[in-house]
């Protein structure tokens, strides 16, 4: 089990806007190489991101599914990269003044990570998830806010 926290210098809504755009996942999720498709209903429960993980040309095609979500507060995912395994990943957002405390928790549910002791698995997951939250923060803090185009 890995649990990593970071304070992001923007609002929960801005962080959620990154989480809610499935096409952005390879920009901030360490190990995600590309997105092949995103269900139109993302990030609703049951929606999937169809991704590839690894380094080209050694890529694994699989998906990540939303198990639970509360817009602006929480998303719980089932991330797959078979035969490497599956994991449950929870990302929670808590307002902290004008900032957001973000916590990512990851727990392997199948594959090698599920049978190895946490003392073996956690250091690598923690290292990866520190970088994942760093990348998420860069996007949420610095991505321009787009205004709707005039319809008139």
Can you say where each PLM-predicted feature lies in the sequence?
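Hydrophobic ligand-binding cavity/cleft-lining segments
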Residues: 1-44, 141, 152
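Intrinsic-disorder/low-complexity, polar/charged segments enriched in Ser/Thr/Lys/Arg/Asp/Glu/Gln
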Residues: 1-7, 13, 48, 61, ...
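Hydrophobic/aromatic beta-strand elements that line small-molecule binding cavities or substrate pockets
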Residues: 6, 53, 62-68, 79, ...
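A short, structured loop/turn motif at beta-sheet edges
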Residues: 12-13, 40-43, 67-72, 92-101
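Short glycine/serine/proline-enriched coil/turn segments at secondary-structure junctions
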Residues: 43, 56-58, 83-85
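Short beta-strand segments that buttress and anchor functional surface loops
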Residues: 48-54, 75-82
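Short, cysteine-centered beta-strand-loop-beta hairpins and adjacent loop/turn segments enriched
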Residues: 54-60, 110-113
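Beta-strand/loop substructures that line and gate deep hydrophobic ligand-binding cavities in soluble
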Residues: 78-131, 138, 147-149
